[in-house]
Amino acid sequence: MAEKYSLTVDSRLERLSEIANFIELAARSSGLNEDQTYDVQMAVDEACANVIEHAYRGRANGTIDIVCEKRGKEFVVTIQDFGERFDPKKVASPRTRDPLSKRNIGGLGLFFMRKMMDKVKFEFSAGSGNRLTMVKKIKK
């Protein structure tokens, strides 16, 4: 039986450190090494910061549900929110080859999530809001 780790927090930026600690515990307990754990922490931090900033538009009364689970040789993180709908197809790809002086500030969160994780999937339904599922393969 897979071990599940669950955390529910309100949508305040101050919760990001609590989320990072939760992810570290769940990832290390599931067999991820230090580098893999760091990748997951960074991806989840980006995702949750985006939920707070964009889905809830900075409102502190939103809810973020995070579930982590080891499934075979994969570590699966699901992040659920009930904020404004997110459509990743509407996010322009960052121009990472442009000089820094010509780049916009921000806009790299989705790019980083996809680089750090092995799978990234977004879903939305009117009844259950936004659901982000990210997978990291567990390597020894």
Please identify what each model-predicted range represents.
Residues 17, 37, 41, 114:
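Conserved catalytic core of two-component sensor histidine kinases
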Residues 3-34:
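Helix-loop-beta hinge of the Bergerat
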Residues 23-45, 102-104:
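Conserved short strand/loop->alpha-helix "switch" segment adjacent to the catalytic nucleotide/phosphoryl-transfer site
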Residues 47, 51:
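Hydrophobic residues in the alpha-helical elements that line and stabilize the ATP-binding pocket
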Residues 1-6, 52-140:
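Conserved beta-strand-loop-beta-strand hairpin that lines the nucleotide-binding pocket
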Residues 20-26, 37-38, 81-83, 92:
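Short hydrophobic/aromatic-rich motifs at helix boundaries and adjacent loops
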